[in-house]
């Protein structure tokens, strides 16, 4: 019965609802957490004054104008339900109920499902880790359904890498054991929900920070103090991120301030420069590198060395024969300097020691000096003080950095000490000084006495006294025998006095030298001798050699300087004839006069040997640096006069220059315009009628070429060298033309005359009957057809030594050899050829031919 009743009511309501139809659009809805959605409830029917209401899943009626779940009545036939920022609790069936004015109701429902969308709740980027630690990459995913998490790196699943260091934890975090710098990069955390086909991912940047490593380039740095130098300490640091650098000195931070003149940092602070290093900068410096991953430091020891410096010396004063005196020297420096002692004449510290107690005491062999050293202090003790100990003492402090020296002075007071030659020689009328040297401190007063009488006096008018700080000179001019004898020099100071007797002795002439040996040659002889046994009290000034041929009455003589002759004990006499017996004797000359003459010693000169000896060569460089004067010192001529010298020279490894022929009287040859900075060799041969000597050899080097400095910097000032040379050549040619024309008209000779004779048929100068002496070069018809030349010299020729009737070389002596081939004469155009040589060469008349012929026959 009850079921029937319910069915009746249902049919009633259905019949009524036909007129009120309720629809909700959309009919169902899914909302992701946090999203918003609205639903429209629409009523269809004729009912008026309808009431539309919304009910929550828990049956509560929803009121309008709420903030999160809002109900808005649009018009009589619709109403909107809006859910803002949905959450899980908002899920359920929402009902829209429409009530008519007759109380009838119609409703519609919508099932609202709220789900959590796949989202990343905690997956920060970047995530940083320290190299070497176990890194865990965080990625928290929220979703309604449990998601599947996949980790990817460089597009590949990290699990597929088969690297045991990569592990996905139970909370879906990715763990990398012992993470490396190479593991750095982008990692993708990817979530998937199979039921919804939903996928989402998050790229996480993984940064691996590397702890800094730091190393000092030099763990120990040495510097020298007080030289104004700078020193730079350098540390090399690596790490990621790039580490910042800082420095400490003995544990205290070094800060660079503005206008800091002591410390300078590089841009990255890896270098610390310390300016004007001094001893206070010696310390332990630490460079510190720091970044996110940690910090590390390195230590540098700065060792500052100092040059030695003498810090204390003191002058001392002592009395002669005092027991001892000590000189002290103190020095600073690092390393600790060693201190040595010396004077101007001796190195005390390097002398052999009688005893040496290291390191305190060193004693000289004579026990007179003792050196004691300890650390930076050294002392020099002198025992039994002598006046010769006075003077400068130099203390030198040395270490590996350098050295320093200071002088101190020891003043020794002592009574006068006199010195000087006791015996002084002179002769009547010859002025002489008697020297009395005085050593005294304090200075002494010097007096001269003669027979107890103070000098000078009225009785001795020929005496004068001259005093200097170190000596007194008694000038005596003896008038008679009475002026010779004893003279007394007395010196007095506050310490004591001293006297010294001098004897003025009358000098005598020297005894005779003794001839040991005579070494004869064909034209010279060397006399070896011993000096006189008695000089007469005064130095020998000269030696006199006398010689003559046996049977002659007249002695030839020559004076020789005593210093030069005494060096080898030899004098050389020249101008002798070959195969002739001579007697020679010697005498010595001093200020008093010529002494006894020695006994004569006979010798016989040798026959003519033929070739002369090679000359001795000495060079003297010119001021210009590329010229030289070679002096020719004549030696033995072999018994025949030297005709000429032949000179050849060249730069080493170069060709020989043309031979130069010098007359026999020449004593030098000038070589000019030589190559700069080149080594030259010179050969000189002497030639007489018997032949040539061996070559004398001389080697020299020219100077380096000086840098030319123009007199005027203007390039256009003055004429160039080429222009000047050109002008001179033009002038010279014009002069030659003028001279030739003059010769043509006045003497009927010259170039124009030759042209006139050969081309124009004019009669030459020979047509006028002039002989050979007036216009032609002389030729020797029977021997040589070369022109005879003369050599002008300033020296006289030496006499012939062979005793024959040889004609001596004179101004007409020919220098050409008769054995050479003839030269054809060109009388039409006779010209003189001049070759560059120190001697002047010219043609001479033919009458000189006979002289050459006679000389050749000799």
Swiss-Prot record:
InterPro entries: FN3_dom, FN3_sf, Ig-like_dom, Ig-like_dom_sf, Ig-like_fold, Ig_I-set, Ig_sub, Ig_sub2. Residues 740-858 are cytoplasmic. Glycans are attached at residues 222, 315, 347, 433, 459, 488. It comes from the Eukaryota. One of its GO terms (molecular function) is virus receptor activity. Residues 509-608, 611-706 form the Fibronectin type-III domain. Changing residue 488 to Q: Loss of polysialic acid addition by ST8SIA4. Loss of polysialic acid addition by ST8SIA2. Loss of polysialic acid addition by ST8SIA4. Loss of polysialic acid addition by ST8SIA2. Significantly decreases polysialic acid addition by ST8SIA2. It holds the Pfam family I-set. Residues 1-19 form the signal peptide. This is Neural cell adhesion molecule 1. It comes from Homo sapiens.
